[in-house]
A protein has these predicted regions:
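N-terminal, post-signal peptide beta-strand-biased segments of exported outer-membrane/organellar beta-barrel
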Residues: 1-98, 354, 380
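Outer-membrane beta-barrel porins/channels
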Residues: 3, 20, 75-76, 81-420
Length: 420
């Protein structure tokens, strides 16, 4: 329920209650550092029973920890508003979603496990065809070198108009243009160890750009009455399809099921879900204000790749709490918390896209450099709850396994606001 220049994003209707007419602008830079890790454990084939003509399975599962790192040192955003009497026009440009960029220097378990199963099955076929002359290839006989980089950004440009209907009520209507830009770039090379000949067993290579765009209608209201302020905003669902521009896609026939979504020209739904935001703030003392806020993202009604939104138990709930203290005339400090609760399920989670319930804590300060200029700084960190996904058919290998998904997130922000 903030009434400030950053309300162009969070509470645009509230900008009608800015204290003075004129033009305002805010420039913000955030730095985000994340980890996205997968602790994988899955069964592998270790031989072939020639009597019963069935593969044998290792007693000890294959275990590997896949580390994903993401760093975005500069995430810019610009907010602007012009107020004249009861009318206010506002807008912003920012990166509003997409998840950023992540690098897995040891690849992903979905590709490595499928490669291991494919190598084994191919060797069994040769073993049978040659009457046992060609050896069965098991994981101890080869090495796999793999890596995967993935990035997703949604660039947004919003413009809208607020109107102060009465002394205590205002409304907003606007639209946001969203441009999606993503890329997957990775490889997998499997080779026999030198003492087994050093021959190539399997090679995968992928370089796929993804783009798309969509429009989001936005409505908002704000009620300001004495020490109390209430703001609400509704963002309609954005229909967004992303199209592949695949520059490279090399794979064996056994990997057809894995690479299908990355083929050139494939269109995939990637809707931005509708979102309802309601917030209230109250100034208990001249120098002390507290606020509460709630967000609901209707993920189950947003189209996703393979229709996986149907696997969600429900949409996402977010609960936010904050407090501000004006220490002196030119200094305000603040603190806040956020709880994010997804409606996750095993069939929704995947190695290339997984979420974890979380809570975040943040602290900030605002310094008035002059009557017209303010400097804001803030720091936030997020603690995630690990998510364990158990599978009877691990990544299509026909064997059991599990992944434990975990994340960390730290964000530093700096912004400068100016009122002309």
């Amino acid at each position: 329920a903030a009434i400030d220049i950053d309300g162009a994003l969070s509470n645009p209707a509230g900008l009608s209650f800015l204290p003075t007419d004129g033009f305002r602008v805010g420039v913000s830079i955030q730095s985000a550092f994340q980890t996205r890790d997968i602790d994988a454990s899955f069964s592998t084939y270790n031989g072939f029973d020639p009597v019963n003509k069935v593969p044998t399975v290792s007693d000890v599962p294959y275990k590997k920890y896949y580390k994903g790192k993401a760093a975005a040192p500069v995430i810019p955003s610009v907010f602007a508003a012009y107020k004249k009497g009861d009318w206010t026009i506002s807008g912003f440009f920012a990166i509003t979603g997409g998840g950023g960029k992540a690098s897995f220097d040891d690849g992903l378990p979905m590709f490595e496990s499928a490669a291991m199963a494919g190598i084994f099955q191919e060797s069994v076929a040769k073993y049978i065809k040659t009457g046992g002359q060609s050896p069965i290839v098991t994981p101890d006989m080869y090495t796999i070198n793999s890596a995967m980089d993935g990035k997703q950004y949604i660039y947004s440009l919003q413009l809208g108009l607020s109107y102060k209907i009465t002394d205590w009520l205002s409304a907003f209507a606007g639209g946001r243009m969203n441009y999606f830009s993503g890329n997957y770039d990775g490889y997998l090379d499997a080779k026999l160890k030198q003492n087994f000949g050093g021959a190539d067993l399997m090679n995968l290579a992928l370089d796929c750009d993804q783009t798309g765009w969509g429009l989001t209608p936005v409505l908002g209201v704000d009620v300001k009455y004495g020490k109390f302020n209430f703001g609400a905003k509704y963002e309609f669902k954005t229909n967004l399809n992303i199209e592949n521009n695949t520059k490279k896609l090399d794979y064996p026939d056994s990997a057809e099921g894995l690479v299908g979504p990355y083929k050139h020209g494939v269109n995939t739904p990637n809707d931005i879900p509708s979102m309802l935001s309601v917030a209230a703030s109250y100034r208990f003392l001249p120098m002390l204000k507290a606020s509460v806020e709630y967000h609901f993202f209707d993920d189950k009604k947003a189209g996703m790749a393979g229709g996986k939104q149907k696997e969600l138990e429900r949409g996402t709930n977010e609960y936010l709490f904050g407090i501000e203290w004006d220490v002196v005339k030119r200094l305000t400090i603040s603190g806040g918390a956020q709880i994010t609760d997804y409606g996750l399920s095993d069939n929704f989670q995947s190695d290339v896209s997984f979420s974890c319930d979380s809570y975040s804590l943040g602290f900030g300060a605002k310094v008035m450099l002059s009557e017209k200029m303010a400097l804001n700084v803030g720091y936030m960190w997020t603690t995630y709850h690990d998510y364990t996904k158990k599978m009877d058919n691990y990544c299509g290998t026909g064997l059991p396994g599990q992944n434990v998904y975990s994340r960390t997130n730290k964000v530093f922000g700096l912004s400068l606001d100016y009122a002309f």
